[in-house]
Amino acid sequence: MRGGELLGRAGLALLLMAAGAGARPRPAAAGGQPRSSVVLVACDSLDGRLTFFPGNQTVDLPSINFMKRYGTLFLNAYTNSPICCPSRAAMWSGLFTHLTESWNNFKGLDPGYITWMDLMEKHGYHTQKFGKLDYTSGHHSVSNRVEAWTRDVHFLLRQEGRPMVNLTGDRKRVRVMEADWRNTDKAVNWIKEEAVNLTQPFVLYLGLNLPHPYPSPYAGENFGSSTFLTSPYWLEKVNFEAIKIPKWPSLSEMHPVDYYSSYTKNCTGEFTKEEVRNIRAFYYAMCAETDAMLGEIISALGDTGLLRKTVVIFTADHGELAMEHRQFYKMSMYEGSSHVPLLVMGPSVKEQQEIPNVVSLVDIYPTMLDIARIPIPQNLSGYSLIPLLCEQTESEVSPRGPRPSWVLSEFHGCNVNSSMYMLRTGKWKYIAYSDGFSVLPQLFDLTADPDELTNVAIKFPVIVHSLDKILRSVVNYPKVSSSVHKYNKQQFISWKQSLGQNYSSVIANLRWHQDWLKEQKKYENAIDKWL
């Protein structure tokens, strides 16, 4: 398939005949069968709700639809931390964020951390990685880390460019995100030239930047990334009639943490309905381009006859709000930001199955080990997805007992002025903040209120109490919030000292420079007071 040429129905039928779909070998049951190979495609910022109704009405995603037809879709998969590095740290370690202490985009896993891929290599798998990894410490911009460290300071500064759209090229322009396409090509070539000749099973990882928004160079140091960029080719895949314009509360009615997020993301100004619709449409077009890259990988596996021997997993590190709740980006526990896509197809994975159980990215680690028939460590936060994918009973698989009926997500980074913790179970989403007292919690009934417009925490105190009790049994969140508070201060002090005489000029010219330079002394004083 040429770059981004979409898998048509006829193409898919041929692909499956070539791959021998239907005659699928049994999977990771111990014994005679060879172990399956695995391909994991992880993109950045794809809203998981686009993989099922009604979100799937907004944009044509044929590769995702192909995986749904010949595999399993998880309807309630969540990130464990809605920002790049901490989320990926959870996925590569199998541990919750408070256990790895991946507090922000600068603080992830130590470079030598043993991941599931390291263990698979040790147990005889050939391993290969292409594209975005971003799970170790020390990356992302200076602005990004300083904004995270200073979120407790009593000031309010815009840290991003205003979200905007940019149309590039013409109807022939398929490869908009060129770096991602180069990595996709490398993965395709590796499948066709290397994987096809291997005598051992392999695990291939492809990390994509899309559909993360693009940098906005006018917005200062290392810019923010507030530009939704696509070409007419991809925009034609979007069904404009199906785009929902989100309802916004007035600024005065917003939860205080939401207001801080909206302000620092430069979203508290006026936006016309047309602007909001365009931001959402361009975002969906970027998702269509992402889907085409997934299609290239599936096609390469089909062309080489490897598809029937390979478990294919597609997911994302987090979602994208795309102007829901008067915000873009992630860093929020609302569905647009925290709900991720998760689809699996391959040997013995049930076809056309939709799983309602709540799962999260920490489940990838034990799942990978399960596929490779490697004993699963008992200390992991996640549980293998194999019992759900293959309809086995839990007792056959996990000595730890059944998977819990909740998932945990937490956030400690920039654009949010409090640590937050989300417990999702049944129809409820409970969000606790900071020490559990100083900021009011939120409770949403996702069945009655899928858009999360009505916080019912005051209406259901008994539910709040019971969910808070579960949350505290998983994480001592007041203590964690306090640790993050101390970490932020220590990191900031050592950064400030390292700059010496240059401190005032460096801090003034970070992403918030447009606001900072108006009242430089005031903001420096606020920091001194905090310290």
Where are these regions (language model features)?
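C-terminal cap/loop subdomain of S1 sulfatases and analogous C-terminal strand-loop tails that border
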Residues: 184, 318-324, 362-365, 370-446, ...
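Catalytic-site neighborhoods of secreted/periplasmic enzymes
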Residues: 68, 90-186, 190-196, 217-219, ...
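N-terminal signal peptide
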Residues: 14-31
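Short, solvent-exposed loop/turn segments at secondary-structure junctions
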Residues: 45-48, 82-83, 96-98, 133-136, ...
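Active-site-proximal cap/lid insertion segments
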Residues: 4, 24, 31-36, 45-58, ...
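Short, structured active-site-proximal loop/turn typified by the sulfatase FGly-forming signature C/S-X-P-X-R
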Residues: 52-87, 94-95, 121-128, 244-246
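Classical eukaryotic N-terminal signal peptides for Sec-dependent ER targeting/secretion
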Residues: 1-14
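A structural signal for well-ordered alpha-helical segments within the folded catalytic domains
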Residues: 36-37, 58-62, 111-118, 178-188, ...
